[in-house]
Structure formats: structure tokens, C-alpha cells
């Protein structure tokens, strides 16, 4: 028998249920993220000032140069062409985990940047490379140093010299008139297995893209590579037999026919 008490209970239940449903918010609708194309600039930016450093500046955390030009003019760290120089002749020395960004490195310097451990280099430009633009000395097999954006001009030999272990990542980078964009050391006092990842770079007027030592177990992975024909699509990756200190490594050959060169020559574009 349906009583007034039952009717009241049903009414109260429906009222509470309706309130609970009304309290549930409508699902939020978010827009899909906008895909931003990564920039690759081929022009040396204008400097916002100039500083000549008497000695190498050591960076322990992060340093934003705000597009000021730095070099070692008038000091022992000034360019000595292809004379072998060292860390003391660098403009900047990055401690393990340090980062540097928005800097122009002028022509009056011998070594550019030395990374004692894993480092991050963002939007750094070399006006005129002397010996090497950047030297990587990390020692851990899992260490990674990343170079993003920026570019280098007039490197008679190497832009990135990888003397230590681990991996180097180079992306969104411009290189003009150079010997090699990257070289895994083929005759350092201590040999390591190394790898390099190169993505979205423009190579303009160079001899080789990357040079690796296959007998040390090195590998190179290259994507979105563009050149002006120099280096050729074959020479964007070259293999060597590394040796001990005091000897010279021997070149094996270049191109995607070598399994350590992980790229497709026919996919190399133009810039």
C-alpha cells in the first residue's frame, strides 16, 4: 500500500539525486596544443655589447649572455690559428650540469667553450671559429650534452670536438665554411664509445658533417639534414678507425652504407 510517508521518501530521494547531478561540473574542453615550428637561423645576430675576458669564465649554474659578444682579445686565449691550445684558452668553461645561452663568441679566441661534464648550450653563435668551437669532456657513458640553436662560421677544422664519453645532441644549428660539424676524438689519451644525434641542421660549405670511430662502437643518428652541396649527402657522415694518443686515425669511408651512420642519404635536403 502506497502511503503518504512513502511518497514523501521518494520525493526526498529524487530531490537529493537531482541536486547531486546538478553539482557535477561539465567536463572541461581544452584546445589541442599549437605546434610551433622550430627555428633555424642562418644569420649571425647583432651583438648587444662586447666584453674581452682576460681569463676563461667558469660557469657553475646557468648563464644568459643576453647576446653580448665575448672573446679573449689581448690575452693568452686569443686565436692562435690551428696551434693546439687547451681549456685555459677557452672563453667559457662549463662545469658539469651548467648551461649557457644567448651568447656571441667573437673571433679573438682559441677554444670557445669547454664542457667539463654534461652541459646545455642554447643559441650560442661563433663569429669565427679558431681551433674548436666547443669541446665536450663528460666521462659518464650515460652523460648527454645538448647544443640547440645558434651557429658557427669559418671553422678551419672542427666545430664540436667530443673528447669524452656519452652522447652529444645537436639540433636547429647552422654551420658555415667548416671542416667537420662534429668529430668523435680518434686519438685521445682515453678512448670511449660515443654517440651523436643531429637533427634539423643546415650545413653550408663544409667538408664533412660528422666523423665517428666505428672500432670504438660510435654511432651517428641524423635526421632533417640539409646542405648546400658541401658536404655532399654522402659526406654528412664519415667513419674512421680510432687509434691511441700520438697516432692519426684512418678514414674508412662515408655514407649511409655504413651501419654506424644511421640516416638516409637520399633524404638529405638543401639549404
Give, region by region, the residue ranges found by the protein language model.
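Fungal secretory targeting signals
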Residues: 1-28, 32
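Generic hydrophobic/packing signal
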Residues: 12-18, 103, 111, 159, ...
